Amino acid sequence: ILRITIKLKHKQHWGHSIFYVGNNLVIRIKQQPRSLLLKDLTIAIDAGHGGTNTGAGGLTGVLEKNITLALSLKLQAALEALGTKIIMTRTKEEFFDNKERILFYRDSLPDLLLSIHLNSSADPIRTAGTSTFYRYIGFRPLSNAIYQRMLELGLTEAGNNGSFNFMLNSP
């Protein structure tokens, strides 16, 4: 077993990725951007699911993939109106598997990734609500701020959850 410790100069990193390029192991550590103004950020928006991956089905028969795409396109328009550079996983109805998503984000280097999903439950009458998920502890305040704004819409609380592993096992 080989153990490598990397001591960082900055207080909090904005994520990391570990991957191979040929026989080389690459460790990329992301730092906070100099400016946190929306006009200075690059934000990736992932419209969850798509194509043959329909996601959750609602009581009315509406598919998650359609709602996530519609919400993502509205979010794209709102953020672009504020001057934010947006990178979209998909802008139309198509399949985009998780491996493709991981490679897409790894290569495009967004400052933030917002992945839009809706969940289902075996008992949708009793189990409902909105939640946010973040991967790195440094993103908890941002995730919580988004969560609090969502609650202002009158949505039921389902929590701000950490250690979300969307890219944890990336190639």
Model-derived features: where do they sit?
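Signal-peptide-cleaved, periplasmic/extracellular N-terminal interaction regions immediately downstream
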Residues: I1-I43
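Active-site-proximal helix/loop segments of hydrolytic enzymes
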Residues: L59-P171
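Catalytic-core environment of secreted peptidases
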Residues: S35-G61, L114
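Solvent-exposed coil/turn segments that connect beta secondary-structure elements
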Residues: K7-K11, K30-R34, D46-G50, T91-K92, ...
